[in-house]
Regions:
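Short alpha-helical segment of the dimerization/phosphotransfer core of two-component systems
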Residues: 37-42
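Short helix-loop "hinge" at the ATP-lid/N-box region of the Bergerat-fold HATPase_c
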Residues: 121-122
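Conserved micro-motifs of the catalytic ATP-binding
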Residues: 57-62, 102-105
Length: 228
């Protein structure tokens, strides 16, 4: 259904161009931009479905590396901030970890996690001024990432299921937002493949907080250093 929606729109606007319905430069420009945007939607949907098929059958090639938490998230936030600014969405970022804190993670897939969570938040922002808060905390042997929005929130009855594939809270209301319905299930799988855990809290009309934890990297002392 979600793939068919942009295809139907592309066909409709293309037919409008061919039939001469778009009879002014402004209308033609609008139709062409809509076709382009819907084609991008299809591309994103296909990429998500392809990725999920790989993840679901454990065929995704993770490239784990030692990552400095502060440096990595600073780079991510800079990139995210530009995108949110273009959408007139406010961003606040707080990193409470030590400057030397490291994790073992796949940089590309962890970035996908962050982008998917924020992309999902953006879809459901309903306030005049959308806000995203990102906090990185030190919680014992783990780092905890919190991504908070001031969107419409999620009903308590729906909250336990938001990471299930193809699950949509109030699907009839949300159909206009688009998407594959598997973005958060991809996020959950990637975090679990990193040995972490993800969950959410939410209040309707106030907003949602997504949390995930990843174990910190700790040097294991070798036998020689112990004996010395």
């Amino acid at each position: 259904h979600d793939l068919k929606t942009p295809i139907t729109a592309v066909k409709g606007y293309a037919e409008g161009l061919m039939d001469g319905v778009a009879d002014t430069p402004e209308k033609r420009d609008k139709y062409i931009r809509t076709i382009y945007n819907k084609a991008n939607e299809m591309d994103t949907l296909i990429n998500e479905l392809t990725l999920y098929a790989k993840i679901d059958t454990n065929r995704i090639p993770y490239n784990f590396a030692k990552i400095n938490v502060g440096e990595y998230f600073n780079d991510c936030i800079e990139e995210i901030g530009l995108d949110l600014e273009s959408k007139n969405i406010g961003l606040a970022y707080f990193n409470y970890t030590d400057g030397s804190t490291q994790i073992i993670a796949d940089p590309e897939q962890l970035r996908r996690v962050i982008h998917n969570i924020i992309g999902n938040s953006i879809k459901y922002l309903d306030k005049q001024r959308g806000l995203i808060n990102i906090r990185i905390k030190d919680v014992g042997d783990f780092i905890q990432v919190e991504i908070e929005d001031n969107g419409r929130g999620i009903a308590a009855a729906d909250l336990p299921y938001i990471f299930d594939r193809f699950y949509r809270a109030d699907a009839s209301r949300n159909s206009a937002t688009g998407g594959s319905g598997i973005g958060l299930s991809i996020v959950k799988k990637i975090i679990e493949d990193h040995g972490g855990k993800i969950w959410a809290t939410s209040k309707e009309s106030i907003g949602t907080v997504m949390y995930f934890v990843i174990r910190k990297y700790q040097e294991v002392p070798n036998e020689q250093s112990i004996n010395s």
